[in-house]
Amino acid sequence: MESRAADDIWIIKFYAPWCSLCKQLDPVWRQIGSELKSLGSPVSVGKSDATASTGLAKEFRVRGYPAILMLKKGVKYNYSGPRTKDGIMDFVNRVAGPLVRHLSSVQLFQHAMSRHDVMLVYVGATSQLKGNYTSVAEELIVHTYFFSATRDVLPKAVSLPSLPAVLVFKDGTYFTYNEERDGDLKLWINRERFPNYFRIDSYTLYAMGESGKLVVLALVDKNTCKEGLRYKSLVEKVAADYREIYRNFYFGFMEEHDYISGLVMGEVIVPSLIVVNLSIDGYFLPQGDVETERHLLDFLKGVLDGSIQCLGGNGIIQRIKRFVYDTKATLTLVSSQAPLLGCFLVSFPLAIFAILCYLCCKARPTMSNDDDDDGVALLAPSLHHRNKPPQKKYD
């Protein structure tokens, strides 16, 4: 940190020696370092033991392990995606490059379209809207790519009522930002930066909480059975056919259920359907079997009109329950992977509690004895006075 140049770009992994997930990431981290070096990338790759370099970890606000952060021109970017080589490399290429990438030809535009499921594009000359767009890009570059182009580069089917404009291309179509209708630009981009239907993992689902939309999920196994395939195709069909009606919904399927298990605080049934409201940590479950498209549409209608109760939430009681559940799940995981550490984490607070109880119990008789002594001391003069023989009077 003291010797780096102002233009240096670093991606750093913060780890703890006892963290099993950090150890699993080690070979991936070495591959990333080797590949970036062979490509001549300006990004330097490093790692830091957060338990030893506590000052550096505090400066980067490391709260969990492994933490992956990027430092570019004094700005720190936190990576919250899957701990895979492809995911991290995409993050590096996105953040290390320009905030807004200019597409100067039809060929470049088509190439970008083929690589990205969602494309945000600014069209027009310099304007206040472009300034806002660039400011949003600086904050949200960790999540998605930002592009700019001239009108003649766009497909001829794209109709723009006026310039400048911001568009999002996804799901085989496009939408144009309208400030009066869509409100704040950043909030609109957060809502629209995901495909309408796609495979969702726990990292993506967590990030979707900022969109403010409900998420319809088909929970399936990795080796999807016939029933799971039926749920997936049902959700995908409704997502495509009723996109305009359910603009406040995202649709997808999940093959990993740890996040949902934590949300409902229990084991989930697979395959099944669930609608989650990530802004309040709530969820909705169908009241019966969902076998047809009409059943799914009735379920979504019940979610919107309030006839189906929202479970969970982020109230105080729910937060306490979820904290207890997460603590138990963490201790179970740690105990299975590091038994000695798990025993210490369980026994240490119990030992402290036992010591406090012992001290309290020991203090009680001492206080009682003191009180008795004080009482005797107060009574003794009175008894002494009462038993004292009367003095005789003499002339």
Residues of each region from the PLM?
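ER-lumen resident redox/N-glycosylation machinery signature
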Residues: 1-395
